[in-house]
Structure formats: C-alpha cells, structure tokens
Amino acid sequence: MNLAALTAYELIKEENLTDIHAKGYLLRHKKSGAKISLISNDDENKVFYIGFRTPVEDSTGVPHIIEHTVLCGSDKFPVKDPFVELVKGSLNTFLNAMTYPDKTVYPVASCNDKDFANLMDVYLDAVFHPNIYKKEEIFKQEGWHYELEDKDAPVTINGVVYNEMKGAFSSPEGVLDRVVLNSLFPDTTYSNESGGDPEVIPELTYEQYLDFHREFYHPCNSYIYLYGNMDMDEKLEFLDKEYLSHYDKIEVDSAIQLQAPFEKPVTISKPYSIASSESLEDNAYLSYNVAIGTNLESELTLAFDVLDYALLSAPGAPLKQALIDAGIGKDIMGGFDNSTLQPIFSVVAKNANKEDEEKFVGIIEDTLKKIVKDGLNRKSLLAGINSEEFKFREADYGNFPKGLIYGLSCMDSWLYDDDEPFLYLKILDVFAALKEKIETGYFEELIQKYLLDNSHKSYVSIEPEKGLNARLEKELEEKLAAYKKDLSEEEIDKLVEDTKHLKQYQEEPS
C-alpha cells in the first residue's frame, strides 16, 4: 500500500496482526474526519462495512427505522429496494444491516472484485444520500403510519419496524434481554430500546427521524472497515473521491457514556404475555446480572468468557448444578455479553417462580463464596481457555465470512476508543497469560471483586401474565378509536387518501 500517495489520509497506526496473519492499518480521512480500519491479507472473501455510533434518547426506534429506510433507494441507485435487487443479482457472500443498542452497521462481502466494488458503492450511497429526504412514504412504510381503509373503518397502525418490534416485545427472552440492559444502565443510551418500543414508535415524527440521520450519519461519526485481498489504494481513492471529500469535519456528540456504579443492587420485575390456557406456575424467568469493567479491558473480558464456561457450561459446572439441585428453574442459562461498553455477566433460571427470587440470589452468592474459598476446577478453566483459543485460531464461523466476524469484533473496542480497532484481534498472548494464571487464584479473585463485592448489579424477574397481549391490543384499539373521534371530517378524508396513496406507492414497480 502506497500511503505516501494517499494524501487525503493520515496514518494513525500500522500493526502486524500476527494472530490472524494480516497487516492492520488505522487511517483518518483529513477533510471529513472519517475513521478507516484496513486489514490486508490474502483472503479472497473481501469484507466492507460502514458503521455509525447511534446512541438514543428515547425508545422510538429511530436508528432501526433509519437502518431499514436508507436501503430503500438513493441518489445513484434510485430503485425502491436496492437491497432486494442485490440479494437477487449480486455474488455477495454476506449482505445485511444491523441495529445494536449503540451502533448501526452496514456490512457486505464478496469474492468477486467487481461485485464487491458495486456493493460498496450501493451501501455508501445508501447511508450518505438516501431517498428518505425526497419520499416520506419510505418512512411511513418502514417505520410507522396510521391506516384508515375507509371513513367507517377503525384506525390502525402499520409499518415494518413497528410490526417487527411488536413480535420482539412479545417473546419472554426478548423482554428479559431488554429489561436486563435497561436495569444496569439507567442513565445511558442503554436505558432505551434502540430497536423501538411499539408503544413509543408512533411518537416519532418524520422531521425527528430526518434530524437523527443528519446528526449521526456524517463521515466523522463513521467507522469504515475493509478486509481481505484487494487493491486498498484504489478503494481508499474511491472512498475519498466519491464520498468523503464532499464533507468537512464537524463535532458529533455521540460518545457512549459510562453508567456510574450503583450503591446497591436494583430489583426489577416485568410481565410477559402467555395464553389463558398456559400455567402461571414454573413460567417465570429469574436473572442475576452484573456490570463487569469495560470492553476496553480485553484480558478481563476474555477471563469472564472463561468464567462463564467454568461456572455455567462445563460438565458439573458448580453454579448451574447448585441451582438445579435447589430446584430453581427447569433450565439454567448463563451469558457473558460484551456487545456494550460495560459488559454484562448474567445467570438466568428459566421456567422458575417469582417467589424463589431471594433464594435464587442467595444460592448464587453462597456458591460463589464457596468457590472463592475452595477454588475453581482447574480442568474447567483450562478447557474454557482452550475452547475460546481454538475458536479464535480456527476462525470457522459457519456461513459468516471470517473477515466479517473480525470486523464486528473490531467494533467491540473501536466504538469506545477511536484509536483501538484491533484489540480483540491480538489475543493469543492474552490466552497464554490466562493459562499461566490458572494456579494463582486470579479467577477466584475476579469472582470476589466483580461478582461478590460489586454492587453494580440487578435482580430481574420476568413474570407470566395471562392475556397481556390481548389487553394491550384492546387498550391500543381504544386509544386509536379516541384518536379517530377527535379528527375532523377533512382529517378523516385525508387519512383515507393517505392510506390509498401509500398502498399505490408500495404497489408501483421499482
């Protein structure tokens, strides 16, 4: 790569990423402030993504709606659904877009040079020059809109994201994941639902949605990633000429804030809906959740991956076994999730009962105290480290290109530190260090410090409620009936007309 000739960019760092047999470069585009990570190696399955840091102040789902809508046509590619066209006609090995609690990412992959260049162009034009400013119908179709078939019909709400999130909000696991995240970080972006809460989505206006895109979809708030065997100089010149050089650097306030630690654990209970024929008994979820350091501490993060295995997944895992022996829940699940700035360690009892919550917490903490005193099973720790190391070395991610998984793991650190994209691609030394620490009491000390002595935790229960969904639907119907009652004749006629117009728009060919 001829960096001297690429005058539009500044080289921030260059690293030999020996763990993945590649060379890594971190660049900054001088004019726009865009950040670019390059991983150069001989992998023909090339990967590109552009991501944006997208914190939210409410649960209207605006980043999720933008993720859907920017892929509904752009300046260069004005067809109504370029995404579907690409799925049908491209040689891609991966093509998608994902909304996370704090970021939105648009990745593509292909082994064909020409196809890869085209995919890059379509996605870049989509995020920077979408048709959303020209056609409000896109927002209505993908986000939400009122529908009125004729003036005597009831008013309803429709929209792709709105309907998708209604489904997500009705599953107990979905409710649990959301409540756990909200419970541990009440003063940050994570206290809101970035995907959208169906009760709140209809509060989002078209103008607020456009404002969010204007604010956050600027190159200086972007994370651009290129991976594989390609002419990097050519790609960087294309990025500069076609997109980045059209922007001047601005300040975007999108930093993800740390949650101040709790003085004492919080207890939260939320309902989820079951059918009237289902039993209330043995149908609750109990969850013990702790915030663990930050994602910029790679050794701590990997050590907790290992602890997750040793405590909850290994044969005879002591924490799981203690809860099963006590008859709490029919299934015990664990999880260490580092997809947020402050990772979360959780223990979940499924098919449990709310009245066992105190006992559930007591057994977890008594068992952890005993483990600290008596020591963890050394074989389980070593097996956990070996398993994580093997997965990393093999880099076999099924249908997902390994360059994509590497790229998403870059975001685990890069999103929170602009100068640190490669933290989780340099971890073989960390695995070696963890093996050395098995006999030193290091893992037991982590349990004491981060699980027992740490008050930044939450106890969450998700309880079954018969007919909850039906009740919520009835409340919505009543609310919409009241809304319609307040409309004038002219407003009702306009809503009927708008409904017809949107249906016509949706039926028009691309």
Name each region found by the language model.
Residues 60-72:
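Active-site recognition of the HExxH zinc-binding catalytic motif
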Residues 2-7, 55, 69, 73-76, ...:
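Charge-rich, well-structured scaffold segments of protease-associated domains
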Residues 37-39, 49-51, 107:
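Short, conserved beta-strand segments within well-ordered enzyme catalytic domains
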Residues 44-48:
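Short, conserved catalytic-motif segment at the N-terminal edge
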